[in-house]
Regions:
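An extracytoplasmic/periplasmic, membrane-proximal ligand-sensing/linker region
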Residues: 32-34, 243, 265-329
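Hinge/capping helix and adjacent helix->loop/strand transition within the periplasmic-binding protein
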Residues: 85-91, 105-192, 241, 254-287
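N-terminal (or domain-start) structured segment
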Residues: 27-116, 155-157, 163, 179-208, ...
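Short beta-strand->loop
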Residues: 113-123, 181-185, 203-204, 213-251, ...
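N-terminal secretory signal peptides that target proteins for export/translocation
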Residues: 1-6
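C-terminal segment of classical bacterial N-terminal signal peptides
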Residues: 16-26
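Sec-dependent signal peptide hydrophobic core
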Residues: 7-15
Length: 329
């Protein structure tokens, strides 16, 4: 009998069992310190406000504080890269919107792979968009807008918040659906664009309801319709663009939560349960509603749902963005 070989095998087996026990113990103990939730945009913006609302409720579920950190730059790719390179221990999480799906096309030299370098946690909330016109812009309804757009084409100016912004994506989809080309006017954000729209220097703006509800309720803009698949409970008289003749038109600002690739399954489950806990929290539901956000149904609050949705969105936007031949790098 080879005693040294037997001892070596026993030690290896003991080490394997020890690693399993250690991993299980880690998952059971998680979290033992604050968890970072990285936001790729400025404090005070819609994604940041949503993240901070979720963080408060997630903290209750996890038993540790979830701290929101803002990491700005390059349309969210700076923050994405930070998370992709972080330790997959569950202490670095990330919330992002449609930009996660457009980055692989807009940036030809991404330092990460959007599909394979992250752990999927959950979809969380959608924010519909609205198509608005200046009070000085002639069309009053969406059918009138469609007719006018096909007559005037590039004489109509359409604002956006820059390449890859959801306002720009909405404008791209709108022009494709209409078969016309508008004159794009880029701004540093939709806030300045709204000021120009209110002043009559702009014709049209597509922006999320978090930004446009005050103007809509104040009747200082013309509302042509909403970009969601169905009418909104808080804007019941606003038709969808689908209803108005733009078949299959839909764009919402969707949000998902991710972690670095390689997170332990048990940790993913704990984080996912914390997200689901938050999405059922009446305070979160109310504050999300105040933003114009719609909590996704439970069936979408899973890692698999987020993974499938991201793939669909990448495939949806890639041909449109490539056809425009505009890149961010």
């Amino acid at each position: 009998m080879n005693v040294s070989k037997t001892i070596r095998s026993a030690l290896l087996a003991a080490g394997f069992v020890s690693s399993l026990v250690s991993g299980a113990a880690h998952a059971q103990a998680y979290p033992t310190k604050p968890v970072s939730l990285i936001v790729p945009f400025a404090a005070g913006g819609p994604t940041d406000v949503l993240a901070r609302t979720l963080a408060v409720s997630m903290s209750k579920s996890l038993g540790q504080t979830v701290v929101v950190e803002n990491r700005l730059g390059a349309g969210g790719t700076v923050a994405s890269n930070v998370v992709a390179k972080a330790a997959p221990d569950g202490y670095t999480l990330f919330i992002h919107h449609n930009g996660m799906a457009t980055a692989p096309t807009l940036y030809r030299k991404l330092p990460f792979n959007a599909l394979t370098d992250f752990t999927y946690i959950s979809l969380v909330a959608d924010v519909p968009m609205t198509l608005l016109g200046s009070k000085k812009f002639p069309p009053n309804t969406m059918p009138e807008f469609i007719k006018y757009a096909k007559q005037q084409g590039d004489k109509i100016n359409l604002a956006n918040a820059g390449l890859g912004a959801v306002s720009q994506l909405c404008g791209t989809l709108l022009q494709q659906a209409l078969g016309v080309g508008f004159t794009a006017i880029p701004f540093s954000g939709t806030g300045p664009a709204m000021v120009a729209l209110l002043g009559g220097q702009l014709d049209v703006l597509c922006d999320q309801t978090t930004q446009t509800l005050p103007q809509i309720k104040g009747n200082t803009v013309k509302l042509y319709g909403v970009t969601s698949a169905e009418r909104l409970s808080y804007l019941p008289d606003a038709p969808t663009l689908r209803e108005s003749g733009l078949k299959d038109f839909e764009i919402v600002v969707w949000h998902g939560i991710y972690g670095p690739k390689g997170m332990a399954p048990d940790v993913v489950t704990k984080v996912n349960k914390a997200v689901q806990y938050a999405l059922k929290d009446p305070d979160v539901i109310q504050k999300a509603g105040d933003l114009g956000a719609v909590i996704v149904p439970v069936t979408k609050q899973t890692p698999a749902a987020l993974q499938a949705w991201l793939k669909l969105e990448i495939d949806k936007w890639a041909p449109l963005l490539k056809a425009a031949n505009q890149y961010a790098d």
